[in-house]
């Protein structure tokens, strides 16, 4: 058992795979288990989960830096990006980074039947290339290797008329950034936000030119949720809640147990902790510091050597990806270096 930033974690030594699956605080796991136990005993009621959904939504808004009425709930990044892709005009042009995580790029590529084209370019060139495109979509931090996009360049591109869609899945939770200026921000909860799989959020700019249609309109997106269960007419919320999907209840229970805590932490201290460990590994491997919590190691036999040392990472794009979160320690970094040096 470890204690980090005031919470206990039952995370094993050498676990460096938050970029794949985040490990929740013990209290969050207990909250989900209690919810499942209520369900098993027939003690759960649908409305019981509304406070958890609201708490997670509010904390996500805080983390991104937007008003809560700009936030919708979903189940995955790809379905939320799909709403945006479907809103592009026929023949629209989209720019993405080379090797981008496909939950960001595939929904746009699937619109080829309407003449939408998706162009790849190097991550470092996105800001320069973006003007002239209808939309640029990119992860704030790249999943494969932890590189960070130049947000200032993208913000300048937006001023020229290009819509900007950001996936914060690999950044939110360790990288403090205010993203209220983007047209849309999507984020899955099960990595750095330490939530169960099945919860994601979408923050939308109400003055954006994105003409989103609530294709997954449901009772939970209603103006008054519990008065929107039966019958027409359509009566959706006036806020971003109109884009809500029905909540995966227990995922939101977990989110409510962890996100308010994350949102209340000293975010600069969290970043310094995570990046400090990652850069210590880079330095020990004669790699330059990168200012990222993710390290990609592409060396012969690295996967076998790390596995033998009890290090848990992921193989991504031909390299072993190691990710350092707030529950990791200097001992985890030392375990990597002992195995590889």
Language-model features: locations:
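Pyridoxal 5′-phosphate
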Residues: 1-341
